[in-house]
């Protein structure tokens, strides 16, 4: 697929040379050249580092919701599995929901501004999340975590857009995007380690207060380290689609809320399925609005079949990952009776394996099409989940559990860079924020809604909480189904790419006649 992307870049460059006299505002699909930014080596290292912290802190925030999950729940007066799953789900919900809007705002007002504001917002709501301990309310904590999730929604797409605009397609860009992807498992591990230390040995609110301190430091570094990128004429004339934003966010929030609230109160409660229906209707209205507005949040012209298939794979794979991670933690704590710190230690290979996967992906992207890399990543998600789903409770950690922890990060760090690079190189410069948003939206939203679906399966099959292992295995089997779907779609995408190449090499007779007639 990388060759496909490069060929598209060559094709579009030729088009730019032919149509350079056209007005860029009227032809927004014309890719604009990457701005040349002069930076010293130290400045460039700091810039790449602060951009990668966006992914690091996003996944650290998820780790903070999962590692001390049971300790936080007990301090707030709940041990209900459905309510506990809301801790990570509420965070991932807003991360995935607001990314598209944040990317669009970055395109309009500047990616650097949105990036710095994202860290300031992260700081504020991390502070409040810690103080929610005094409210002794699960709902209060969930709301705080949901509002905290808006911050990574601003960080991720704008960080990726900044990298996409500073670096042209090439080896350096491939390496940087691979490093960006490598921070995902290490960010989760870092968040889990510190939250486990504070929750088990001190006091869990310090997890969030420490995060607030780190975020304000990153905001200051970002303000000085991120280079100034001049807005072009196209960006200055862009406007925000408020109507599309309203229906898009409403639809995504209501659908996700329904799926995650169903396991808590039961699907027989009227407001759960009513909100689900309203959510789907809102998304239908969103699609209709986007087709009619002049400057939509998600331009229909940006999408094609190849991109759609890749995004489906990402959604299926990361839904599988969210289920794998959450229930692995519950399995190790509740059935193998490990402490949060011991579980974190057992998950340490995730970071090492993730780095190896990211570097390998950066190497493979120069030699294989991203569609093939996507197949491998989906297989990694699926195999990792199958291994833990079939692991006996009293089996040694070094058997299936360890292998599962080694294999699964390859799904994370192969799928994210491949999908992000393809979209970043494909779309025009003024849509870099939206391109970055698409992958990040699908990743985080699928984690949240995947947990909701798995939670529904778990609560219906664990015999009202008596048979924990049956509920956990059922959730993992649901995750395996998601992973299998990703494998199938990825394989179909590979075949489709070969068919497309074959058709291009052997044009049919009617096409020749049509071109002859035009001449």
UniProtKB/Swiss-Prot annotation:
GO terms for cellular component: endoplasmic reticulum; membrane; plasma membrane. One of its GO terms (biological process) is ammonium transmembrane transport. Its main location: endoplasmic reticulum. The keyword Endoplasmic reticulum applies. GO terms for molecular function: ammonium channel activity. Gene3D superfamilies: MFS general substrate transporter like domains (1.20.1250.20). It holds the Pfam family MFS_1. The keyword Transmembrane helix applies. It is a multi-pass membrane protein. Keywords: Endoplasmic reticulum, Membrane, Transmembrane, Transmembrane helix, Transport. It comes from the Eukaryota. The chain crosses the membrane at residues 37-57, 82-102, 114-134, 146-166, 175-195, 209-229, 240-260, 269-289, 309-329, 337-357, 373-393, 402-422, 434-454, 475-495. It is found in: Endoplasmic reticulum; Membrane. Belongs to the major facilitator superfamily. This is Uncharacterized MFS-type transporter C1683.03c. It comes from Schizosaccharomyces pombe (strain 972 / ATCC 24843). The lineage of its organism: Eukaryota, Fungi, Dikarya, Ascomycota, Taphrinomycotina.
